[in-house]
Regions:
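Loop-to-transmembrane-helix entry motif
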Residues: 60, 122-125, 220-224, 265, ...
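Transmembrane alpha-helices of multi-pass inner-membrane enzymes
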Residues: 135-136, 234, 264-322
Length: 332
């Protein structure tokens, strides 16, 4: 799976290829979120929305977080496309995707939505208006969802009575014990009855970590977790640098928008992933790869003193200038 991430670094060399990659990502996940949103509306939210079988996002929780990660990319495509009907379609996709997240009845996704909503509000220039709209939208959704959804969301406050939540806490403690005993962790196949009998507080609750952080901690130890967090932190820094470099450059507005939306995707992953085993899911690694490409392009042009308007995601002025950055961009 991770081979495709390296191919992203090698093959994505211009605006057209990067936008095509984003379209593939959006359509791959958006297909399931679109029909999931329709399903939720037709059934009144009485059933869970699941992803494609035998995939990383087959369960409802994983699909919901993946949808939250893709929705900012939908916003990016909505903003850059010049075609009216494509914008209408992307607007509908955003609406149904949001509904599908609620329809997943995922408690982790609810927390991720809160984190994403707060980040959007924090970065908004019209905080009063955006805050009002967020409250109205949340109120409408809460009124629409059935009692079973409300009961499941309220169980967040009474996690001690939830067997699933207590199993996760048992697995998290197992991860800490393994990392404390083994410098580089116990490997990818450590989630077994034999290992839980040695390291878990309750050896009878053999359960996956359901957390990107504790999963990496058990698999690779404290060193692996530090490296994992460092990669996420560096990706965030790359995007922040792109945002700063393109802030006052109208010709680089698309790069600025993409960097900001990728940060929202990372917020969704880091918050929602705290309760899901998606450490090796390829989507966040593609986002990290794109952040490397964007930052490398701007950093290299600053070093050689070139005009930033020839960035990988430049704002097109004319067909002749639209694909000026055809020069191969080596991976970072």
């Amino acid at each position: 799976i991770q081979v495709m991430t390296f191919l992203t670094l090698i093959l994505i060399i211009d605006e057209k290829k990067l936008n095509l990659l984003i379209w593939v990502i959006v359509l791959s996940v958006g297909f399931f979120s679109f029909k999931g949103g329709i399903f939720t509306l037709m059934t009144g939210g009485a059933f869970h929305v699941f992803g494609p079988p035998a995939s990383y996002i087959s369960e409802n929780n994983a699909l919901a977080v993946a949808v939250l990660m893709v929705m900012p990319l939908m916003v990016y495509l909505y903003r850059i496309t010049p075609h009216k009907w494509v914008r209408y379609g992307m607007g509908c996709a955003l609406f149904f995707s949001l509904i599908s997240v609620f329809g997943s009845q995922s408690r982790g996704a609810l927390l991720a939505m809160a984190a994403v909503g707060f980040f959007f509000w924090l970065k908004s220039k019209t905080k009063i208006l955006s805050g009002f709209l967020l409250v109205i939208a949340a109120s409408l959704v809460f009124a629409f969802m059935p009692q079973s959804w409300h009961e499941r969301m309220e169980s967040i406050q009474t996690y001690e009575e939830d067997e699933s939540a207590m199993s996760r806490i048992n697995s998290w403690q197992y991860s800490i014990n393994v990392a404390n005993d083994r410098l580089t962790g116990a490997g990818l196949q450590s989630w077994s009855k034999q290992m839980f009998a040695i390291y878990a507080p309750n050896p009878n609750q053999v359960f996956v970590a359901h957390s990107i952080y504790f999963s990496v901690l058990a698999d690779h130890g404290w060193l692996g977790l530090i490296l994992f967090l460092s990669v996420l932190g560096l990706a965030w820094r790359n995007l922040t640098q792109v945002i700063k470099r393109t802030k006052n450059d109208p010709d680089s507005s698309h790069s600025n928008l993409l960097a900001r939306m990728l940060q929202v995707s990372l917020i969704a992953y880091m918050s929602g992933g705290a309760f899901l085993s998606l450490s090796y899911f390829d989507l966040p690694w593609h986002i990290i790869a794109i952040s490397v490409l964007l930052n490398y392009q701007f950093a290299s042009r600053e070093v050689v003193g070139l005009d930033l308007s020839s960035d990988i995601i430049q704002r097109p002025k004319a067909p002749a200038n639209r694909m000026r950055s055809q020069q191969r961009m080596p991976p970072n």
